[in-house]
């Protein structure tokens, strides 16, 4: 089975005090789904992670309770790559046909200063 990324979505990078990290993640997922011409209800699984923005699986509260399997991945700075690899493996194995990968965070000013 071939595996491809068919949609991408990003929330604007920068300060967004009016939005939580979770809301920014949901915005990115909606943009990716629109880019792919798909709907959240069509997704069979999701993998995602966040260090400080909340549990990624809680995005279902923003996107809709469809019953899909949402697995939290946490692997520090490699969370995005690990989530993509997990999704690739799930589709390549034939277990699923369509899914979402998302990563998001929101840090206070100066969070990366030593």
Give residue spans per PLM region.
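Functionally engaged cysteine thiol sites
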Residues: 77
């Amino acid at each position: 089975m071939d595996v491809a990324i068919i949609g991408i979505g990003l929330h604007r990078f920068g300060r967004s005090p009016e939005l939580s990290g979770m809301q920014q993640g949901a915005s990115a997922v909606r943009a990716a789904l629109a880019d792919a011409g798909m709907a959240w209800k069509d997704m069979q699984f999701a993998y995602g992670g966040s260090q400080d923005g909340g549990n990624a699986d809680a995005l279902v509260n923003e996107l809709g309770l469809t019953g899909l399997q949402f697995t939290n991945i946490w692997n520090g700075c490699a969370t995005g790559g690990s989530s993509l690899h997990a999704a690739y493996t799930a589709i390549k194995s034939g277990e699923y046909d369509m899914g979402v990968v998302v990563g998001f965070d929101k840090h206070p000013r100066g969070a990366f200063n030593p």
